[in-house]
Amino acid sequence: LGWIVCPEVLMRRFVQAKQGADLHTGTFVQYVANDICQRGFLKQHVKGLREVYKERRDTMLDALAEFWPDGCCWTHPDGGLFLWAQVPGGIDTRDFLTQALEAKVAYVPGVHFYPNEDGGFDAMRLNFSYCPPDTIVEGIRRLGVALKKALGA
């Protein structure tokens, strides 16, 4: 069960795709989803999630400023669950991932977000959605230590 927001001209195609995928979402599930929306539970839940993710985003931003070496830069997203960070010194984040994993931290190298993998060699996507704030701080600290070591700082 889900919803989509799209131009009206595309809606028929999406309905057909949904019908082709599973024929019909169960009626009971539809009634429950409708009740959740009508009573405001979904709106309340989304509001709570926004607060949680904002705290985690802000925690990551603060930790980056505290623990990462000079020359690194990152986005300050207004939405989503990820930060985009760039590192200096010719570090290829595909290769650096091995050092990060040794420090028990993972990220997605930036190159994987380029269609021909022809860019983003110095970039990484960092996820703040899953971990609690204290884990985010520790992970960013560990990455900072590894980056400083890789840069000889």
What are these language model-derived features?
Residues 1-153:
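PLP-dependent class I/II
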